[in-house]
UniProtKB/Swiss-Prot annotation:
Sequence similarity: Belongs to the phospholipase D family. Cardiolipin synthase subfamily. ClsA sub-subfamily.
Gene: clsA
Reaction(s) catalysed by this chain's protein: 2 a 1,2-diacyl-sn-glycero-3-phospho-(1'-sn-glycerol) = a cardiolipin + glycerol
Protein name: Cardiolipin synthase A
Transmembrane regions listed in the UniProt entry: 3-23, 38-58
C-alpha cells in the first residue's frame, strides 16, 4: 500500500511539473509582447495553480469552436460582397488629406475597402440629444433597424428607446438587437428582453458567459461595439452605451459618464452594416449582408460630405489593425495631437509613438478622467505619467465625471472616434469599431468638444507629480507590471 501511495505521489508531482512545463512552453511558443509573456510566467511560477487556471481561461484568444467555424465560413461570402461593392466607385474617396493618407491606405489594404465619401455627420455630446435623435430616427424607420451595444441598462431614457424600438417592430420594421452577455446582464435579468422578443425584435445575447465552458472560450472576450444602423442609410457609433447617465453606476463615486456619439447619413451605413452582419453571423449562424447603397437616396455628389473609414477589430477581423491605425495616426501628427480615453494602458509601441511625437515638437495632450471606475486600470495608468511628462506630453485630468469618450484628433483634420480604449483589451482582444474621419469641419467640432473637456480638467504639474508619496509609486509599479494582462 505504501508503494502504491508513493507511486501515486510521484505521478501527481510529475503531472504537476509537466503541466507547468507545458504551459510555459505554450507561452514561449506564442508570439506575444515580452512584458506580457514575462507577467504570465511570473504568475505561473509564484502561484502555479492559480496562474495555470488563469492562463487557460484568459491567456489566449479563444473564440470558441462553433463561433470560429462560423467566422471562417463567413469570410468567402463577405470578401465577395466587398469585392462587388467596389463596382460602386462613386461612393469611394479617390484621395485624402496628407495627414490621413497613410492611415486610409493602411485600412484599405488590410480590410479590402476604401474610405467612403458623401456622408453627412453630426457629433452629439449630450445623452438626451442622442436618445431623442435616435427615437426620431426609429419612428421614421421604413425597413430595418440593427443595434449592438456592450451595455443596455434599463432606466430613464433607455426605456424610451426600448419602447420606440418595440413600436417599430409591431408596425413591421425588421429589428435586430445584439447585446453583450456580461455587459448587459441587468438587461437580460429584467423583463425587457422578453418584452422585446414578444414584440417581434430579434434579441441576441452575444458571447454568453458560461463557467462550464471557461477553458473552451475566453470569458473576457467581449462584444464592445456600439452601433446602430437604420434603413441602411442612417448610422450611429461612439462611446455611449444604451444607458441614461443619470441612473447608470451612480454608486461608483465617479459622477455621470460623459460620452460622444456620431450620427451619420450616407454610404457609411453600408460599411458599418457589413461589420454588423459579420458579428451577427458569428453569433447566430445567419447571414444578413446588407444591400449595396441606393444611388437614389445617397448624397454622393455633395461637396460638403465627409470621408469616413470604418476600422473593425476582434477575432476574425484583420489582426492588430486598430493598434496599427493608432500608431499611424500618431506618427502622422505634425502640429498637434489630442487623445481622450477613460482607460490608458498603452502598448510599449504606442507609448513610444506618443512620447516621440512630443519630442519632435508636436503639441501632445491626453485627457483622462481624474476618477476611474476601475481601480486596477486607474493605478496602472499612473505608471506611464512620469515618462509622458518627461517627453513633454500634457496630461489633463477631467473633473466633470467619468470621461468615457474615446477620441483622437490629429492636426485638426484627421479624427478617430469610436469604442476603442487605449488599453490592451481594446487594442487586441474585444470586438471594437473606430471611425477615421478625414475632414476639417468635423475636426473643428471634435476640437471644440476636447477644449470643453480641457476647461473642466486639471493640468498635471510635473513638479508636484514627482513629489508624490513613495507608497503611490510602489502601487503604480505593481499595477504597471500586470498592465500587459489588463
Amino acid at each position: 500500500m505504501t508503494t502504491f501511495y508513493t507511486v501515486v505521489s510521484w505521478l501527481v508531482i510529475l503531472g504537476y511539473w509537466l503541466l507547468i512545463a507545458g504551459v510555459t512552453l505554450r507561452i514561449l511558443m506564442k508570439r506575444r509582447a515580452v512584458p506580457s509573456a514575462m507577467a504570465w510566467l511570473l504568475i505561473i511560477y509564484i502561484l502555479p495553480l492559480v496562474g495555470i487556471i488563469a492562463y487557460l481561461s484568459f491567456g489566449e484568444l479563444h473564440l470558441g469552436k462553433r463561433r470560429a467555424e462560423r467566422a471562417r465560413a463567413m469570410w468567402p461570402s463577405t470578401a465577395k460582397w466587398l469585392n462587388d461593392l467596389k463596382s460602386c466607385k462613386h461612393i469611394f474617396a479617390e484621395e485624402n488629406s496628407s495627414v490621413a493618407s497613410s492611415l486610409f491606405k493602411l485600412c484599405e489594404r488590410r480590410q479590402g475597402i476604401a474610405g467612403v465619401k458623401g456622408n453627412q455627420l453630426q457629433l452629439l455630446t449630450d445623452s438626451d440629444d442622442v436618445m431623442q435623435a435616435l427615437i426620431r430616427d426609429i419612428q421614421l424607420a421604413r425597413h430595418n433597424i440593427e443595434m449592438v451595444f456592450y451595455i443596455w441598462q434599463p432606466g430613464g431614457m433607455a426605456d424610451k428607446v426600448a419602447e420606440s424600438l418595440m413600436a417599430a417592430a409591431r408596425r413591421g420594421i425588421h429589428c435586430r438587437l445584439m447585446l453583450d452577455s456580461a455587459g448587459s446582464v441587468a438587461f437580460f435579468r429584467s423583463p425587457w428582453a422578453a418584452m422585446m422578443r414578444n414584440a417581434g425584435i430579434e434579441v441576441v445575447e452575444a458571447l454568453k458567459v458560461n463557467l462550464m465552458r471557461v477553458f473552451l472560450r475566453r470569458m473576457d472576450l467581449r462584444q464592445h461595439r456600439k452601433m446602430i444602423m437604420i434603413d441602411n442609410y442612417i448610422a450611429y457609433t461612439g462611446s455611449m452605451n444604451m444607458v441614461d447617465p443619470r441612473f447608470f453606476k451612480q454608486d461608483a463615486g465617479v459622477g455621470q459618464w460623459v460620452d460622444v456619439m456620431a450620427r451619420m447619413e450616407g454610404p457609411i451605413a453600408t460599411a458599418m452594416g457589413v461589420i454588423y452582419s459579420c458579428d451577427w453571423e458569428i453569433e447566430t449562424g445567419k447571414r444578413i449582408l446588407p444591400p449595396p447603397p441606393d444611388v437614389n437616396i445617397m448624397p454622393f455628389e455633395q461637396a460638403s460630405g465627409h470621408t469616413i473609414h470604418t476600422i473593425a477589430s476582434g477575432p476574425g477581423f484583420p489582426e492588430d489593425l486598430i493598434h496599427q491605425a493608432l500608431l499611424t495616426a500618431t506618427y502622422s501628427a505634425r502640429e498637434y495631437l489630442i487623445m481622450t480615453t477613460p482607460y490608458f494602458v498603452p502598448s510599449d509601441d504606442l507609448l513610444h509613438a506618443i512620447c516621440t511625437a512630443a519630442q519632435r515638437g508636436v503639441d501632445v495632450s491626453i485627457i483622462l478622467p481624474r476618477k476611474n471606475d476601475s481601480m486596477l486600470v486607474g493605478w496602472a495608468s499612473r505608471a506611464f505619467f512620469t515618462e509622458l511628462l518627461a517627453a513633454g506630453v500634457k496630461i489633463y485630468q477631467f473633473e466633470g465625471g467619468l470621461l468615457h469618450t474615446k477620441s483622437v484628433l490629429v492636426d485638426g483634420e484627421l479624427s478617430l472616434v469610436g469604442t476603442v480604449n487605449l488599453d490592451m483589451r481594446s487594442l487586441w482582444l474585444n470586438f471594437e469599431i473606430t471611425l477615421a474621419i478625414d475632414d476639417k469641419g468635423f475636426g473643428a467640432d471634435l476640437a471644440a468638444v476636447q477644449d470643453d473637456y480641457i476647461s473642466r480638467s486639471r493640468l498635471l504639474d510635473e513638479r508636484l507629480w514627482l513629489k508624490r508619496p513613495l507608497w503611490q509609486r510602489v502601487a503604480e509599479r505593481l499595477f504597471y507590471f500586470f498592465s500587459p494582462l489588463l
